Design a protein with these regions (language model features):
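Short aromatic/hydrophobic "clamp" motif used to bind/position activated sugar donors
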Residues: 89
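Short, well-formed alpha-helical segments that are part of the catalytic scaffolds
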Residues: 15-29
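A conserved acidic beta->alpha catalytic loop
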Residues: 25, 42-51, 93
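Acidic donor-binding loop at a coil-to-helix junction in glycosyltransferase catalytic cores
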Residues: 183-192
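Flexible acidic/His/Gly-enriched loops in nucleotide-sugar-dependent glycosyltransferase catalytic domains
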Residues: 104-177
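Cell-envelope/extracellular polymer assembly enzymes that use nucleotide-activated donors
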Residues: 4-7, 37, 189
């Protein structure tokens, strides 16, 4: 049914200074490259971001490039959802990177708990350049790997789509989409909707 095991949606907008780091982190993933597609969706960038995307796509088959008129991050992610051909869909902002085994670990966890869960989240380690910052407050709640109920008030604030959630691809026309009317917190609403 699905062509790939994992689809990564990367909204791209005026990010030429850090886009290569993001894309290089995807090339280092331990998941098999034939199980991976990366949708680079340019949202009307005015800098060289689209050119960088095209360069990577020419050299590496995992990258697929799309160019849209500026519509905002939610519309860009929705376009990605509609074009994703992976069993699982994850999101990565163009100024973020993943550790090398992230996608394989997430896909394996989903495989083991497929019937129990709708969404997988994983740790964010904030850096600015080489400087590491304190962990996000949510890690006071998420102390171990496991299955958490997001309807439980204790755990309802642990997700965001910037770079640390993965969802099941339910197939054409069945996936939850982002609310394009929201200027912020669209990711939190999306997670609750999932």
């Amino acid at each position: 049914m699905f062509k790939y095991r994992m689809s990564v949606i990367v909204p791209v907008y005026n990010c030429e200074d850090y886009l290569a780091s993001c894309l290089d982190s995807l090339l280092r993933q331990t998941i098999s490259k034939d199980e991976l597609e990366v949708l680079l969706i340019d949202d009307g960038s005015k800098d060289g971001s689209l050119g960088i995307c095209k360069e990577y796509a020419e050299k590496h088959d995992i990258f697929k490039v799309f160019s849209l008129e500026n519509g905002g991050v939610s519309a860009t992610r929705n376009f990605g959802i509609e074009h994703a051909q992976g069993q699982y869909i994850t999101y990565l902002d163009s100024d973020d990177t993943l550790t090398d085994n992230t996608l394989k670990t997430v896909a394996d966890f989903f495989d083991r708990h497929f019937d129990e869960i709708d969404l997988v989240t994983y740790k964010i380690v904030p850096y600015y350049g080489e400087q590491k910052f304190a962990l996000h407050y949510r890690y006071k709640l998420l102390k171990k790997t496991g299955v958490y109920d997001l309807e439980d008030p204790e755990y309802c604030y642990i997700t965001q789509t910037t770079m640390n959630i993965c969802v099941k691809n339910l197939g054409e026309g069945k996936n939850v989409l982002f609310d394009t009317s929201l200027a912020f917190h669209e990711d939190q609403k999306y997670c609750f909707d999932v």
